[in-house]
């Protein structure tokens, strides 16, 4: 978020684009703020609390259509897409010494599903269901980020779900401190999941992404950037133009491991909510 906020910002008095200054939108100062995740971000955009935000493609589509996990809620018809950014892989992490080797092995175990307002919680719930389990079949914990990895490291939980572009810092840190494994999300369960929900795709996390962890088959969703239909057309156009500027490309290439995968060629990949 901070990387993209920097790319689209151009504060008053800053240097010219191409001469050491930002190639962002003139006089725009964008700031990245933390949130509880995809559901929180979508709600904040629709309520006008935030001008834009990142969300998982599945969560945004369900919010826009009032279907899936948002069944019974008023469709978020003002939600609009700016661009698809990168893939976020579902990491199911357990200690290497554990006997958890598949999703079905989670039955009866202490599992962090993340906070109920997050996209991770939604995905974890669907992954459990596609493998014949429900959230009531596990001892669910609502831990996020470092609280989740610390709990796994200290034996307070048996497994954690994390949805993030790899490598994600919290798991890099965890894997350097204790022997962990990524539990596969594959086979019939993954096939059922990707067949029912088109936003999921089967995609591996390569060997060596995390210390001592072999390649594992898992599933992924798209991380996309959203705004409201009420935002000014010209402003969103200029923001989009700044995002794809060649100077912004340099920032993204070095700013995050996933930065290089944010490209104009994939900007419409998996988009299920109308563009602004």
Which stretches of residues belong to each language-model region?
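Bilobed "Venus flytrap"/periplasmic-binding protein-like clamshell domains
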Residues: 1-20, 28, 84-154, 249, ...
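Extracytoplasmic
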Residues: 3, 25-29, 37-40, 47-50, ...
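Ligand-binding clefts/hinges and TM-proximal coupling segments of bilobed small-molecule sensing domains
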Residues: 110, 116-126, 198-266
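A structural signal for short loop-to-beta-strand junctions that line the ligand-binding cleft
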Residues: 72-88, 208-217
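Extracytoplasmic/secreted proteins, especially bacterial periplasmic and envelope-associated proteins
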Residues: 3, 7, 40, 44, ...
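Pocket-flanking alpha-helical
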Residues: 18-73, 146-151, 157, 166-175, ...
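An extracytoplasmic/periplasmic, membrane-proximal ligand-sensing/linker region
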Residues: 4, 147, 154, 164-182, ...
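Pocket-lining segment of extracytoplasmic ligand-binding domains
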Residues: 57, 68, 98, 134-232
